[in-house]
Amino acid sequence: MILGIGSVVDAPTAALYLQLGANFVVGPLFNPEIAPVCNRRLVPYCPGCGSVSEVGKAQELGCDICKVFPGDVLGPAFVKGLKAPMPWSQIMVTGGVKPTKENLEGWFKAGVTCVGMGSNLFPKEAVAAKDWGAITRLCKEALEIIRSL
């Protein structure tokens, strides 16, 4: 099993979770102080980036995959525009990604490597009702859509 930690905004928090065994670190923002903490332990750091400059700097500091966040604000056009001058970039998008063919197709056609869909795959109502079948169906449907792209 691979277990990561998300929404990390500072180096001490990253270090704490790495000591507890996290296999990767994801952040909503790009904090250059987190990269060396993760690099020292050979643990991937996926920072949240909102500009081409942030993606470029994150790559220089060893981030193989950069998270574009918030995806619903930046949109697939941002990813397509970023990849034009930087085609080597591996992009994960989160924030507003929906488990629908139209939405996922837009992101993958733009060039993302992967997507994150937390709350859209785990709706609060389904979690509160402990409707694990509904959550399982949503996840399976999303994977089927991604496989078809």
Placement of each model-derived feature along the sequence:
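Glycine-rich beta-strand-to-loop/alpha-helix junction loops that act as flexible
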Residues: 5-6, 93-97, 115-119
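Catalytic cores of alpha/beta
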Residues: 10-20, 53-61, 78, 97-115
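Glycine-rich phosphate-binding active-site loops on the catalytic face of alpha/beta enzymes
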Residues: 25-34, 68-75, 111-132
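Mobile acidic interaction elements
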Residues: 73, 80, 88, 100, ...
